[in-house]
Amino acid sequence: MGTILDKIVEQKKVEVAELYETYSPVKEKRKTHSLVKALEQFTVIAEVKRASPSKGDINLHVDVPKQVKTYEECGAGAVSVLTDGQFFKGSFHDLETARAESNIPLLCKDFIIDKIQIDRAYEAGADLILLIVAALSKEKLNELYNYVLEKGLEAIVEVHDEQELEIAIRLNPHVIGINNRNLKTFEVDLSQTEKLGKRLNEENLLWISESGIHSKEDIIRVKRAGAKGVLVGEALMTSSSISNFFEDCKVNI
């Protein structure tokens, strides 16, 4: 019996095959927006997330333009958009809609296993690509990271444990994302940020904390660990006051 991540990657292989049948990448270059620049101060990457394998439907009928506009008005430094359809009920259309509304960096949040997905994300308006170490061989990670650079985009290289972290450090990527969620079990443990953050601080690398961030106390905790930003989805998608959440993020430590 495979893990949740295994099932997702198998589905991605099907989607990649379909993309090669139905999609022809465009060659035009376009302007992009930098997350690295945004992370010069503590930044919230606010996510458009309709559903997830662990929570089921979160906000299935979200008005993407309105949500993205609210995020930007409240002070988000970037917006993340789930483009996976099978497990998270997102789409590249959501990414395109977000791009039409936003002038801040946009992350394509998906399980990227092939260059053609990066081409599709680029065309949809992404500035940032998520590369998940747990989903890729070292060779494939290197290949896709170099392709992200070739496209003029930035990468968030995502890790969950020490072994994945060492692989990511060797890439010297734009940004490392510590995912507090174990993608094999989907359990969340915020202490991963503290454990792995120490090593990243030693290397003086730019990093953010992802998943399981719901409160002012969580924000304080990840800031103290040295994170330069947080990626927040569920808490914002279910919040009755998005502006209050952003106010909590301004807390000084």
UniProtKB/Swiss-Prot annotation:
<dbReference type="GO" id="GO:0004640">
    <property type="term" value="F:phosphoribosylanthranilate isomerase activity"/>
</dbReference>
<dbReference type="InterPro" id="IPR045186">
    <property type="entry name" value="Indole-3-glycerol_P_synth"/>
</dbReference>
<keyword id="KW-0456">Lyase</keyword>
<keyword id="KW-0822">Tryptophan biosynthesis</keyword>
<dbReference type="GO" id="GO:0004425">
    <property type="term" value="F:indole-3-glycerol-phosphate synthase activity"/>
</dbReference>
<dbReference type="InterPro" id="IPR013798">
    <property type="entry name" value="Indole-3-glycerol_P_synth_dom"/>
</dbReference>
<keyword id="KW-0210">Decarboxylase</keyword>
<dbReference type="InterPro" id="IPR001468">
    <property type="entry name" value="Indole-3-GlycerolPSynthase_CS"/>
</dbReference>
<dbReference type="InterPro" id="IPR011060">
    <property type="entry name" value="RibuloseP-bd_barrel"/>
</dbReference>
<comment type="pathway">
    <text>Amino-acid biosynthesis; L-tryptophan biosynthesis; L-tryptophan from chorismate: step 4/5.</text>
</comment>
<dbReference type="Pfam" id="PF00218">
    <property type="entry name" value="IGPS"/>
</dbReference>
<keyword id="KW-0057">Aromatic amino acid biosynthesis</keyword>
<comment type="similarity">
    <text>Belongs to the TrpC family.</text>
</comment>
<dbReference type="GO" id="GO:0000162">
    <property type="term" value="P:L-tryptophan biosynthetic process"/>
</dbReference>
<dbReference type="InterPro" id="IPR013785">
    <property type="entry name" value="Aldolase_TIM"/>
</dbReference>
<keyword id="KW-0028">Amino-acid biosynthesis</keyword>
<protein>
    <recommendedName>
        <fullName>Indole-3-glycerol phosphate synthase</fullName>
        <ecNumber>4.1.1.48</ecNumber>
    </recommendedName>
</protein>
